[in-house]
Amino acid sequence: MRAAVGLPEGARIVAAMSGGVDSTVTAALLARAGYDVVGVTLQLYDHGAAISRKGACCAGQDILDARMAAERIGIPHYVLDYESRFREQVIEDFADAYLRGETPIPCVRCNQTVKFRDLLDVARDLGAEAMATGHYVQRAMPGNGGNRPELRRAADPAKDQSYFLFATTREQLDFLRFPLGGMDKPTVRAVAAGLGLSIADKPDSQDICFVPEGKYTTVIDRIRPQGAEAGDVVHLDGRVLGRHEGVTRYTIGQRRGLNIAVGDPLFVVKINADKRQVIVGPREALLTASLTLKEGSWLGAQDSLEAAAEDGQRVLARVRSTREPVPGRLAMIDGALSVVFDGAEEGVAPGQACVLYDPADPDRVLGGGFIAGTTRQMDLNAA
């Protein structure tokens, strides 16, 4: 198996190496295809739990794994310290979003800032013609004769990471390559084993690499302790049903952990961070008719997401990485960039991404943005 990335043999390519099997196989395939590969690993954080914890990324043992893999492949390897940058741009942003009552996606923010901005600059400084990553997403030239690449879902739906890469710009996509986009994970592991790489059976990294044991509140409490300030759990009808231990413990659609004794099932339908209130209500209160976007990104035919909204562009909108896209349209409503669903979506959370795909070509990513607000079918304004 060889990596076809549309560059002449001998071209220099920087491979972003996290120490995991995907990025290692990416580097190995490129080297075997005759490219001048330079491996680069970013040290992003360093807490004690990350040194030996399975599923960590870009710290401790992972850096050693990347270095040993580069030696095995026979390519130069550099480690760059981006810990302070990562803390400022990703970890602190993550904590601040929860303080605002949002549910952030740090992987998207990391791709936006550290990986696809800072690391791309490093790759260019090293004289590279492209940078390759181990993401499961496809970069392809359009079939209509266009000269700009498209971002597309991975061939393996179970591993598709297009949701997390919606903010990739046209300029970044010109420079990026994703050799694993057409492969599935068993094939990648088989390639790693065939190459004699010691990380062939290494566990996949966790979604939030800097959160020890999956307890994100541990990180927030350490750097933003005010997030643990108690407040009221309030029903939509105004009744105070109980107390909570901090708004950072909750997300829209959550049912467990409310610690309230009521007969009917209740869900978190709104978080009023200013008043430290967690608002709960019936499931139907989660149904969302439309949402507004911020920090939009666009790869479609129009020049911008706003222009597409003015055109009433039809889209398939995906509001969680675990959900399939649903039909809707872009619109400008009261000056706000909006997505209006044909039906209704449940549990749409501010801070998450809304990723837009092409209804005529559902694997093609058109762009997206972060969810700034929602309009529910049930009026929540009283809460």
Swiss-Prot record:
Listed InterPro entries: MnmA-like, MnmA-like_C, MnmA-like_central, MnmA-like_central_sf, Rossmann-like_a/b/a_fold
CDD domains the record matches: MnmA_TRMU-like (cd01998)
Residues of the active site: 110, 209
Site (Interaction with tRNA): 135, 352
Pfam families (alphabetical): tRNA_Me_trans, tRNA_Me_trans_C, tRNA_Me_trans_M
Keywords, comma-separated and alphabetical: ATP-binding, Cytoplasm, Disulfide bond, Nucleotide-binding, RNA-binding, Transferase, tRNA processing, tRNA-binding
GO molecular function per UniProt: ATP binding; tRNA binding; tRNA-uridine 2-sulfurtransferase activity
Region of interest (Interaction with tRNA), ranges: 159-161
Enzyme Commission number(s) of this protein: 2.8.1.13
Gene3D superfamilies given in the database record: Adenine nucleotide alpha hydrolases-like domains, HUPs, Translation factors
Role played: Catalyzes the 2-thiolation of uridine at the wobble position (U34) of tRNA, leading to the formation of s(2)U34.
UniProt cross-references to NCBIfam families, sorted A to Z: PRK00143.1, trmU
Name of the protein: tRNA-specific 2-thiouridylase MnmA
Organism: Caulobacter vibrioides (strain ATCC 19089 / CIP 103742 / CB 15)
Lineage: Bacteria, Pseudomonadati, Pseudomonadota, Alphaproteobacteria, Caulobacterales
